[in-house]
UniProtKB/Swiss-Prot annotation:
This is Eukaryotic translation initiation factor 3 subunit I. It comes from the Eukaryota. It is found in: Cytoplasm. The gene is EIF3I. PANTHER family: EUKARYOTIC TRANSLATION INITIATION FACTOR 3 SUBUNIT I (PTHR19877:SF1).
């Protein structure tokens, strides 16, 4: 498996995301640049320029017309995907940590950090009503007083969002009323990443407590646990097989004191049902910060602390692989 190396960032990658068809790959890092690439050959299509700080999150809507980014420059920006033009700018009082379009692409949500005396908020804007963005008045703002949100995604059909917190809690907030629908605490430390399955029935969380866990989207029932020896920064579910890929490594501050071999900077593949590890892919010099499966399941990408994004196309053996139960 020879990866395609994407070199478009000077700082460590924070998130990578495919659009729905998978022909484009969006990458953001701790530099102000937002890149978009052709996933088939790794050619850079262009950049979205305007942010002045690290970009924490990126999302594309259902038909890839718009791109949403959230940054540490205290802003969330909406871009025209094709032209790279900035369509909207929402100012916030602290850094934007997570962002996402709902199923229809009409409503955006983003969460802000708890910093500089400001509380953590989840804001919802309806793009069909331009006055909300112009006046910086979301139709709904949910405060999170106890523990800040470190990762959040839309649930099925845009009815609620699923949020993971710094203290390991998971909860659902209704996108209509803003009330908390349910709350569970299965992780002991911060939840770094949440990704849903292709059909939005389940989602996987990646946590600092060295595990990734699978949950039901609607009931938040805990289904499976994938254990490693290192903090898990990101986890993704294969759209075609019962496979999970985990990316991690140790804390960024400990990286320079260990050799690459001890660092465990591999992407690790687990079987979804049996919770068994069956493969590893080496490559990054440093922890993996974000992983994503291509929507057709034939390739996956990883973005690392080294600032590189690697696109891996699976070998034919991968598709013939039968798991021995």
């Amino acid at each position: 498996m020879k990866p395609i190396l994407l070199q478009g960032h000077e700082r460590s990658i924070t998130q990578i995301k495919y659009n729905r068809e998978g022909d484009l790959l969006f990458t953001v890092a701790k530099d102000p640049i937002v890149n978009v690439w052709y996933s088939v050959n790794g050619e850079r299509l262009g950049t979205y320029n305007g942010h002045t700080g690290a970009v924490w999150c990126v999302d594309a809507d259902w038909d890839t017309r718009h791109v949403l980014t959230g940054s540490a420059d205290n802003s969330c920006r909406l871009w025209d995907c094709e032209t790279g033009k900035q369509l909207a700018l929402v100012k916030t009082s602290s850094a934007v940590r997570t962002c996402g379009f709902d199923f229809g692409g009409n409503i955006i949500m983003f969460s802000t950090d708890k910093q500089m005396g400001y509380q953590c908020f989840v804001s919802f804007f309806d793009l069909r009503d331009p006055s909300q963005i112009e006046n910086n008045e979301p139709y709904m703002k949910i405060p999170c007083s106890d523990s800040k949100i470190t990762s959040a995604v839309w649930g099925p059909l845009g009815e609620f969002i699923i949020a993971g917190h710094e203290n390991g809690e998971l909860n659902q907030f209704s996108a209509k009323s803003g009330e908390q629908l349910s709350n569970i605490k299965e992780h002991t430390k911060q939840i770094n990443d949440i990704q849903t399955s292709r059909d939005m029935t389940m989602f996987i969380t990646a946590s600092k407590d060295n595990t990734a866990k699978l949950f039901d989207c609607t009931s938040l029932k805990h289904l499976k646990t994938f254990r490693t020896e290192r903090p898990v920064n990101s986890a993704a579910l294969s759209p075609i097989f019962d496979h999970v890929v985990l990316g991690g490594g140790q804390e960024a501050m400990d990286v320079t004191t260990t050799s690459t071999r001890i660092g465990k900077f591999e992407a690790r593949f687990f079987h979804l049902a049996f919770e068994e590890e069956f493969g590893r892919v080496k490559g990054h010099f440093g922890p993996i910060n974000s992983v994503a499966f291509h929507p057709d399941g034939k390739s996956y990408s990883s973005g690392g602390e080294d600032g590189y994004v690697r696109i891996h196309y699976f070998d034919p053996q991968y598709f013939e692989f039968e798991f021995e139960a």
